[in-house]
Amino acid sequence: MASRGKSETIKLRQNLEEQLDRLMQQLQDLEECREELDGDEYEETKKETLEQLSEFNDSLKKIMSGNMTLIDELGGMQLAIQAAISQAFKTPEVIRMFAKKQPGQLRTRLAELDRDLMVGKLGRDLYTQQKGEILIALQKLGEKLSPEDEAFLSENAGAVFNQFQKVSEGLGSGDKVLALASIEVENTRK
């Protein structure tokens, strides 16, 4: 008992991160295989995955209400789940890196996007969407953006930024996070 639950907390956090990774990978795989699936199959699979995310979010709410030592660590995961549920972010890979607070990997992905656009491997619309998501995630993680990135965000990321702002408003209060999560889950179920 000397650890006062520290090892259990670490194990729980690890299990939660693995489950979040699995769900985000499932969303990413679904998007990558979209062309191979018929419309109904795609929609049904996406709906099931979003339901699993909602259930995971409900579990996080229960854990957060009963174990205050995990609130800070789980808050980031919950925000990422809310962003996925509300579809503020369309790229599961970005959601995963944001949830794990990995600004270095987000910046690497940003460089890959720039390269892919230059060689013609990526269309302008998809580039704009993904770059906007990454820049917003970096900003929310407290990272400093270059003046060029700030300008890109102000020009292109209005809708994504507004949705994400809605999801992350009032994050200072655990009660507000839980209330917002409940609203997002209910909206998803409708």
UniProtKB/Swiss-Prot annotation:
One Pfam entry name: ICAT
Keywords: Coiled coil
Keyword Coiled coil found: yes
Transmembrane domains' residue ranges: none
Classification via SUPFAM superfamilies: beta-catenin-interacting protein ICAT (SSF81730)
Coiled coil recorded as keyword: yes
Domain of life: Eukaryota
GO molecular function: beta-catenin binding
Residue ranges of coiled coil: 3-63
PANTHER family: PROTEIN LZIC (PTHR16505:SF8)
Similarity comment: Belongs to the CTNNBIP1 family.
Protein name: Protein LZIC
